[in-house]
Amino acid sequence: MSKVYDWFEERLEIQAIADDITSKYVPPHVNIFYCLGGITLTCFLVQVATGFAMTFYYRPTVTEAFASVQYIMTEANFGWLIRSVHRWSASMMVLMMILHVFRVYLTGGFKKPRELTWVTGVVLGVLTASFGVTGYSLPRDQIGYWAVKIVTGVPEAIPVIGAPLVELLRGSASVGQSTLTRFYSLHTFVLPLLTAVFMLMHFPMIRKQGISGPL
């Protein structure tokens, strides 16, 4: 076993990386409220795992979506648990993200030199809200249908470009298969990819600049 470790150590300097991680200075004012960002990340990872599991059974069509969700909840092994954990962690992710934003704002974590960290965090907040909107429509039940109809209809009030924006969001003049396909693609591919990209920008900046000082 030591030979295997030595082989990797010689090429990757694993011990130096481990020492850097474990020896990072943590300011004495840090408390549990500074863990909210990490909890949000944990919720996101749970979302990825449970969401991936549900893609094996979910069918993104207007005729089969609701029935496939019913199948997940009643027939698939532990499907009810996986979907419930997905929903609970989604709510927890939104709550933790909001509390994290408040903590950062109240402790001045957005000030120089951490402006870019704040900007990437705001983008992650928008992506989190987008997860909620797109995911809400996927069961294709009455609540999801009307929620999507209202949300996608909001831009209609914008002069000139309102109607084209609505059609772009829905994929047609009304909420239908094109809308479900768009939202499913956004929810399962585009948004997770963008979230991962901005997280890979967000965390190294925190690592480099350290935790902001007390007020």
From Swiss-Prot:
Note on how the cofactor is bound: Binds 2 heme b groups non-covalently with two histidine residues as axial ligands.
InterPro entries found in the cross-reference section: Cyt_b/b6_N, Cyt_B6_PetB, Cytb/b6-like_sf, Cytochrome_b_N_euk/bac, Di-haem_cyt_TM
Membrane topology: Multi-pass membrane protein
Membrane-spanning parts: 32-52, 90-110, 116-136, 186-206
Entry keyword DNA-binding: no
Record: residues binding heme b 1: H100, H202
PROSITE patterns: CYTB_NTER (PS51002)
SUPFAM superfamilies attached to this UniProt entry: Transmembrane di-heme cytochromes
Pfam families given in the database record: Cytochrome_B (PF00033)
A GO biological-process term: photosynthesis
Main location: plastid
The entry's keywords: Chloroplast, Electron transport, Heme, Iron, Membrane, Metal-binding, Photosynthesis, Plastid, Thylakoid, Transmembrane, Transmembrane helix, Transport
Gene Ontology CC annotation, any one: chloroplast thylakoid membrane
Binding site for heme c: C35
Residues annotated for heme b 2 binding in this entry: H86, H187
Cellular localization per UniProt: Plastid, Chloroplast thylakoid membrane
GO MF annotations, alphabetized: electron transporter, transferring electrons within cytochrome b6/f complex of photosystem II activity; metal ion binding; oxidoreductase activity
Superkingdom of the source species: Eukaryota
Cofactor(s) recorded in Swiss-Prot or TrEMBL: heme b; heme c
UniProt subunit comment: The 4 large subunits of the cytochrome b6-f complex are cytochrome b6, subunit IV (17 kDa polypeptide, PetD), cytochrome f and the Rieske protein, while the 4 small subunits are PetG, PetL, PetM and PetN. The complex functions as a dimer.
Family: Belongs to the cytochrome b family. PetB subfamily.
Miscellaneous field: Heme 1 (or BH or b566) is high-potential and absorbs at about 566 nm, and heme 2 (or BL or b562) is low-potential and absorbs at about 562 nm.
Job of this protein: Component of the cytochrome b6-f complex, which mediates electron transfer between photosystem II (PSII) and photosystem I (PSI), cyclic electron flow around PSI, and state transitions.
Protein name: Cytochrome b6
Organism listed in the record: Jasminum nudiflorum
Gene symbol of the encoding locus: petB
